[in-house]
Amino acid sequence: MIEIISIYWIKILATLLVLLALIILFLRSGYENLNISGAELVRRELDLLNDNYIVLCNVIIHLERGMSHIPYVVVSPYGIFVVACCYHLGKISGQKNAREWKVRGRGVDETILNPLWENRKYINALERKLNQSLPLIPVVVFTHANLVDDFGPAAVGVGRLQKFFAEHTKVLMGQVEQKAVITILKE
């Protein structure tokens, strides 16, 4: 009788240990990307693009009130992708056209300027710099945040970045235009 009871408890203990190990693995896998910087996550995704895409980093632009840089500009036959990055942690909420958005997470509530508007400033500056009518496609990449509201197709999580590029397949620029853009942006 004692042997049956002890075997019973050993089975229960083993089952609980396996269950605990699975829970720990599940929780750790959800946070593995938090150990990687947002810039590195975006860079890894952009490195997966094929040879049709030329990725330029930290493109310097002149704004109305000084200078700034665009984290990434991707030149391709399908357009010029203007990639801004948002590295905030937590849940992001707000209205697509609102000036400010809310970030809630880990006991901290903060307000940020609308990243879509910031990206629009980059596009306006690029239009002036390129001095041509070219297809500029905005994309704001959120690396560690969950988007609570729908901010439109230009706001994507880092995991959807490849899909975003795959959705743009219509050829809009020739090679001569691409090379001219790359030359201007590298100045």
Give the ranges of each region predicted by the language model.
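Surface-exposed interaction regions that form or flank ligand-binding interfaces
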Residues: 1-69, 74-80, 86-94, 100-187
